[in-house]
């Protein structure tokens, strides 16, 4: 897919299709009015006849509009002008792209990027349009024998900006949007792979493939024998029931000075979670291939920052593991000694992600990090609390939490800060060990974060629970690519990347 920006009037555009908006009720945007004028009132006559009301997402594809150089004009309903917000804008762009792709318009000039969106500028509108386009066109066809692709798919999009002085901003937005989309696609491709293909070794191989592509990226791994020597017995216990070896992949992006403390991202990489001995119900268990969504998100974010070659140092950890029932599997009642030396009583083997992450979070102390962010499909409780719209953010450092929430607002990849109060720590008490791996039903996402917080006392840390946002079920089942946009924005902010650079 090719993207570009230009600044010009619609009547001078020669393309397969021009895309312009119509507000509700039946009111042409200023750009559409220019086309209406040169066509002798052709568009306004259609609206008077009631062919298009202008409701959000309505589409009307016109062929051979009088005096218009382009073959087609796509009228897009944008709703009420004063009510156009971020969510509606992205939905309109997505539906527009799907319509263009399905109707044989191989290229188009889109003027929707000139629409006024509350509190958003040209950079945001163009970048979100690029990301929404790539998201709308995403397919996972690698394992299908019949691909079912459109005969004449959309191949080129031009987004118009209001003035020539905004061309540089628009070009920057395209560059950033493409890099974020690249990372999101990597995340989705890896997460959508079935667990008989995507195992911990597969995660490592995908990281190595990126290493071959980018000069500043170095990839290494820690195998089970090395984990044992390091005392990572909690991590090892989770994978004991699987024939697939646990592998922790280490990705290092070295874009900053050698003495710059790195930002560390740690992704939970349970490539399949059966629940272990505390086995899950059969319904929707297939979706537990997405329990490596945290690792997939970190892999995608590392792809984005490598593509942008951000001038900072970032370490990405993919904590690969598989939780299966077996004669060798760990059991409820077991007491595990973690890499930190703290002991954990296992109450439920399906609360395994935190047992993998706690050792990974201890391991990363060796990098003397500026900060650490772990990303995990950790708890169903977070889905109950926040649904499928927002990622839960927990942190032991207020400025870091604010930075992450700010990045979520900038990127449109929504997040909400959750409490991490000492009162919740009491729910983890054990009569036999330093703590249990389960805090009971109340506040399940918070007690899981409290568990992790006991292994992060040596650095500033945030935990992102993406259980509700990493994938969707049902007819449109698949990975969402989140939280790559949010993580990428956070890292771009840290690198001092601005829209005008």
UniProtKB/Swiss-Prot annotation:
Cofactor binding description: Binds 2 manganese ions per subunit.
Entry protein name: Probable cytosol aminopeptidase
Predominant cellular place of this UniProt entry's protein: cytoplasm
UniProt cofactor(s): Mn(2+)
Catalytic activity: Release of an N-terminal amino acid, Xaa-|-Yaa-, in which Xaa is preferably Leu, but may be other amino acids including Pro although not Arg or Lys, and Yaa may be Pro. Amino acid amides and methyl esters are also readily hydrolyzed, but rates on arylamides are exceedingly low; Release of an N-terminal amino acid, preferentially leucine, but not glutamic or aspartic acids
Coiled-coil regions, chain positions: none
Family of this protein: Belongs to the peptidase M17 family.
SUPFAM superfamilies: Macro domain-like, Zn-dependent exopeptidases
HAMAP family per the UniProt record, alphabetical: Cytosol_peptidase_M17
Binding positions (Mn(2+) 2): 268, 273, 291, 352
Matching PROSITE patterns: CYTOSOL_AP
List of residues binding Mn(2+) 1: 273, 350, 352
Pfam family, one: Peptidase_M17
Known role: Presumably involved in the processing and regular turnover of intracellular proteins. Catalyzes the removal of unsubstituted N-terminal amino acids from various peptides.
Keywords on record: Aminopeptidase, Cytoplasm, Hydrolase, Manganese, Metal-binding, Protease
A Gene Ontology BP annotation from the UniProt entry: proteolysis
One GO cellular component term noted in the UniProt record for this chain: cytoplasm
Localisation: Cytoplasm
EC number: 3.4.11.1, 3.4.11.10
Active site per the UniProt annotation: 280, 354
């Amino acid at each position: 897919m090719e993207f570009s920006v230009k600044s010009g009037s619609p009547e001078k555009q020669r393309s397969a299709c021009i895309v312009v908006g119509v507000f509700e009720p039946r009111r042409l945007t200023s750009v559409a009015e220019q086309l209406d004028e040169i066509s002798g009132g052709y568009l306004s006559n259609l609206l008077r006849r009631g062919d298009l009301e202008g409701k959000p997402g309505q589409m009307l594809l016109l062929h051979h509009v009088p005096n218009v150089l382009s073959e087609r004009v796509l009228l897009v309903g944008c709703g009420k002008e004063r009510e156009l917000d971020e969510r509606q804008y992205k939905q309109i762009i997505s539906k527009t792209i799907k319509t263009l792709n399905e109707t044989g318009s191989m290229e188009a000039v889109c003027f929707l990027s000139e629409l006024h969106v509350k509190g958003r500028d040209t950079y945001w509108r163009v970048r979100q349009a690029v990301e929404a386009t790539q998201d709308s066109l995403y397919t996972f066809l690698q394992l299908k024998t019949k691909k079912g692709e459109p005969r004449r798919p959309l191949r080129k999009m031009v987004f118009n900006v209001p003035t020539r002085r905004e061309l540089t901003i628009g070009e920057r937005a395209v560059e950033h949007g493409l890099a974020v989309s690249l990372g999101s696609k990597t995340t989705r491709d890896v997460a959508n792979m079935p667990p008989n293909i995507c195992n911990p070794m597969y995660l490592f191989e995908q990281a190595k493939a990126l290493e071959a592509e980018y000069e500043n990226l170095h990839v290494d791994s820690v195998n089970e024998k090395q984990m044992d020597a390091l005392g990572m017995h909690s991590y090892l216990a989770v994978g004991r029931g699987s024939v697939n070896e646990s592998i922790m992949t280490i990705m290092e992006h070295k874009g900053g000075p050698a003495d710059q403390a790195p930002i560390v991202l740690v992704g939970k990489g349970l490539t399949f979670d059966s629940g272990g001995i505390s086995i899950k119900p059969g319904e929707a268990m297939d979706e537990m291939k997405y329990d490596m969504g945290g690792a997939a998100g970190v892999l995608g974010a590392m792809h984005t920052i490598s593509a942008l070659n951000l001038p900072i140092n970032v370490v990405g950890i993919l904590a690969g593991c598989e939780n299966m029932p077996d004669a060798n599997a760990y059991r409820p009642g077991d007491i595990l000694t973690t890499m930190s030396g703290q002991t954990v009583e296992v109450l439920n083997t399906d609360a395994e992600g935190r047992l993998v992450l706690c050792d990974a979070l201890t391991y990363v102390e060796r990098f003397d990090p500026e900060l650490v962010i772990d990303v995990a499909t950790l708890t169903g409780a977070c889905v109950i609390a926040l649904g499928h719209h927002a990622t839960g953010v927990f942190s032991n450092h207020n400025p870091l939490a604010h930075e992450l929430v700010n990045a979520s607002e900038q990127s449109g990849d929504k997040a909400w800060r959750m409490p991490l109060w000492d009162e919740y720590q009491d729910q983890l008490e054990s009569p036999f060990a330093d703590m249990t791996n389960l805090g009971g039903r109340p506040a399940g996402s918070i007690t899981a974060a409290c568990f992790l917080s006991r292994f992060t006392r040596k650095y500033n840390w945030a935990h992102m629970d993406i259980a509700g946002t990493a994938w969707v079920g049902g007819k449109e089942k698949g990975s969402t690519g989140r939280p790559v946009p949010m993580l990428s924005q956070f890292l771009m902010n840290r690198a001092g990347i601005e829209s005008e650079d």
